[in-house]
């Protein structure tokens, strides 16, 4: 019973961590699939697509995404960092929470504001011993940004180890990336809407906007389903092992009792 309980507890822990990844989301990428060599040449996925998706009745929130790797520099501390340009709704889409400071808002996006929300890895790498980096200015490549928020530490182990800066996508596009088309969009589906229905509707909308299907949509709920199947299988395996161990232990006890009875009968 204890072994089975441990297995189920581990399964629940994995599912709780998975839920923090924002599994009720749809990601749209240019190209036919991951690894499409022609995806880099497709420039039709734009911020207006994310806005159009955000206005749909099945969507809770949506964000455009552009990313680039740069050297982050603060005084004598430097680190390779991932700069992700996003909309102000990104933090709602992903279910991220603050440890301190604030998220940037629509006004920051409209003004191409050079502000950033950082994760704990960035805070540790660039501000060792500084419990409050708010208001500090970091150089991201050639762009200075002011730190306005620090995210809470992630409770899951699925993230990478690279320090991450979230900045308004408008600032990233004009001052870092030098392009106006997107790497991807991400939308959060309303809780009461089935993911498959939302996927079909989003695909139809973007196909109509682009005039062709030059993108693919990734349903991140597939991750949750795969992890659920795997953890269920592991729980069943642990239960089977526990039953076998119990059976073997019972046979051992029976043998000992039989030997004891035989000896007493002989006496």
What are these regions (language model features)?
Residues 113, 222, 248, 262-266:
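Conserved ABC ATPase nucleotide-binding domain "signature" region
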Residues 71, 135-139, 216:
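Residue-level detector of beta-strand face positions
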